[in-house]
Design a protein with these regions (language model features):
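Short N-terminal helix-initiation segments at or just after the protein's N-terminus
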Residues: 1-6, 33-39, 96
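Active-site HxH/HxHxD metal-binding segment of metal-dependent hydrolases
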Residues: 42, 70-73, 80-150
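A short, structure-level motif marking secondary-structure boundaries and short turns
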Residues: 18, 59-61, 90
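A generic structural signal for short
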Residues: 22, 63-64, 93-94
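Conserved beta-strand hairpin/beta-sheet module of binuclear metal-dependent hydrolase folds
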Residues: 28-82, 86
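Accessory terminal helices/loops
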Residues: 1-28
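Residue-level detector of flexible, active-site-proximal loop/helix-junction positions
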Residues: 10, 17-20, 49-51, 70, ...
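Intrinsically disordered, low-complexity segments enriched in polar/charged residues with Gly/Pro
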Residues: 21-24, 29-32, 39-42, 102, ...
Length: 150
């Protein structure tokens, strides 16, 4: 793909992301999903737009994907409602680097002290090609990329 086609494609994706979820951005609580046990010690704590999961290791919690920054309060509520304390989250592992999966990473680290984890490829994209995270399409003007701990 040549650079001009890439730029046009990126702009189209960004514009689509900015408009497709306007109601979710304005009213995230409408998309709340009551947390539930999937199997054994694995729980669904996401909403109807972004999947997030929690694993109880017995020695602390591992969370997968932090979702959007603007809906962090829903994830915190879901952790409590699932019967856990967010302060027990030891690791927050991100499946990939798109803003709808990493948006609240820094909030969880700042509030609860958990370690932020992403693949080396994801960390490289955030550092070297941040435009691919689609951060400009994020509803929060304060959203930022995080620096992984591991």
């Amino acid at each position: 793909m040549d650079l001009e086609k890439y730029k046009k494609s990126y702009q189209e994706i960004e514009a689509f992301q900015q408009t497709k979820n306007l109601d979710y951005y304005a009213h995230p609580a409408r998309y709340y999903v009551k947390p539930f046990k999937i199997v054994g010690n694995v729980y669904y704590i996401g909403d109807s737009k972004v999947c997030s999961h929690l694993i109880d290791t017995g020695d602390g919690l591992i969370m997968f994907d932090s979702g959007f920054q603007h809906s962090v309060h829903l994830l915190v509520q879901a952790v409590w409602e699932a019967g856990f304390n967010p302060a027990d989250i030891k690791y927050l592992i991100h499946s990939h680097e798109h803003f709808d999966h990493i948006g609240a990473a820094d909030e969880f680290r700042d509030l609860y002290g958990c370690k932020l984890v992403i693949s080396r490829a994801g960390a490289d994209v955030m550092r070297e090609r941040p435009e691919l995270v689609y951060l400009k399409a994020c509803p929060s003007p304060y959203a930022t990329l995080f620096t992984p701990d591991l």
